[in-house]
Amino acid sequence: MKKIILSFAFALTVTSTAHAQLPVTDAGSIAQNLANHLEQMVKFAQQIEQLKQQFEQQKMQFDALTGNRGLGDILRDPTLRSYLPHNWRDLYEAVMSGGYLAAAGETANLLRKSQVYDPCASISDKDQRIACEAKVVKPVQDKVMTSKAYDATDKRLQEIESLMQEINKTGDPKAIAELQGRIESENAMIQNEDTRLHLYQQMAEAQDKLLDERQHELDAKDNARRGYPQPKALEAAY
């Protein structure tokens, strides 16, 4: 009997030892770990989305301050760039040497419309006639140039007013900066053209003096041809 009891006890010991060596699986712990992992993944995804939104906002802010809005030429009238001729001296010299024949374009049209009598038609001497014609054409030419300058300045001021209205319509900082740049450019062009017009007027005054001097010389030449007495200064010249 004692042997049987000892054998049964040994069998229980062996069985217990065998069971102790098998791994134990905790389903609750695995589920919790998986839930924690999924929660971390969701947080990572949210952080990535936030970073993406921040990047998009920064990009929008950057684009708002940089880039080209294409407003550099908005409302720009290219005809305002060349309303005053660059060859003033050539035009004056052409009028002085050609008289009516040198009048062209708007100058010729205005001359035809405004002239009610030709004071030079009865002058037989060619030089005297051309000098007379030059004095007739000169103020007409000045009138055309001054009118062009006035019209161009008026158009530029209208452009500036329109550009200011465009600024009030937009909230884009870069667009506003471009429009302000255009306004500054138009103001600079007005100042430049005003300087050119001032120089033109000075040249016109000098040209008037040259025409007067030429007429005096032609009169003196004609008087000398006719045997009329001349001033001593002119006698020395001839």
Swiss-Prot record:
Residues 1-20 form the signal peptide. SUPFAM superfamilies: Typo IV secretion system protein TraC (SSF101082). InterPro entries: T4SS_VirB5, T4SS_VirB5-domain. The keyword Electron transport does not apply. It holds the Pfam family T4SS. Gene3D superfamilies: Type IV secretion system, VirB5-domain (1.20.58.430). Belongs to the virb5 family. This is Type IV secretion system protein virB5. The lineage of its organism: Bacteria, Pseudomonadati, Pseudomonadota, Alphaproteobacteria, Hyphomicrobiales. The gene is virB5.
